[in-house]
Regions:
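Bacterial N-terminal signal peptides that target proteins for export
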Residues: 2-18
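N-terminus-centered regions that define maturation/targeting leaders and the start
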Residues: 22-169
Length: 169
């Protein structure tokens, strides 16, 4: 059976309408390259402000953007979350030292971004950005788990930009 026939069979079996596939956002930063070292000014050895993130392929129907920055290498169960923010107005750029949207609870129990500060060795920091089809009804007391649950079924596209950091001292 050729491709069109197989596709028609899938549609007739009602399988296709249940598939939900988010497209990929293209993420970059003017401050560090993908899998490159994050400059100290964005860490505990500097001002601990968030780096700028450029978002490519943002779907036109995006109503809000969310970001989670997570270090899976942190020496604690589940890693450490450095930033949780959501209800960010959709735009191609999140500027450095960004304070917009709802700045929610990071792994330290504080709102907003806290820079990388690994105890030893090189850690990987995942800057995960989500394009959503809605604004979320959460407040700033939400953390990573609450945001992930609220985003279910609303992700239009997502991307992951990884930066590395190792303390100099």
């Amino acid at each position: 059976m050729h491709f069109a026939g197989k596709l028609a069979k899938l549609v007739n079996m009602s399988i296709l309408p249940t598939l939900v596939v988010a497209t990929a956002l293209s993420l970059s930063s003017p401050d560090f390259s993908s899998n490159g070292m994050i400059p100290a000014k964005f860490t505990c050895e500097g001002a601990s402000t968030s780096p700028a993130i450029h978002i490519g392929n943002l779907p036109a129907q995006t109503k809000s953007v969310a970001i989670i920055v997570h270090d899976p290498d942190a020496p604690m169960a589940g890693g450490f979350t450095h930033w949780v923010a959501f209800n960010i107005d959709p735009a191609a750029d999140i500027p450095a030292a960004f304070k917009g949207g709802v700045q929610a609870m990071n792994g330290a129990g504080k709102p907003g971004y806290t820079g990388p500060c690994p105890p030893t060795g090189v850690h990987h920091y995942h800057f995960m950005v989500y394009a959503l089809d809605t604004r979320l009804g959460l407040d700033g007391k939400a953390g990573k788990a609450e945001l992930e649950k609220a985003m279910q079924g609303h992700i239009l596209a997502q991307g992951d930009l990884v930066g590395l950091y190792k303390k100099s001292k």
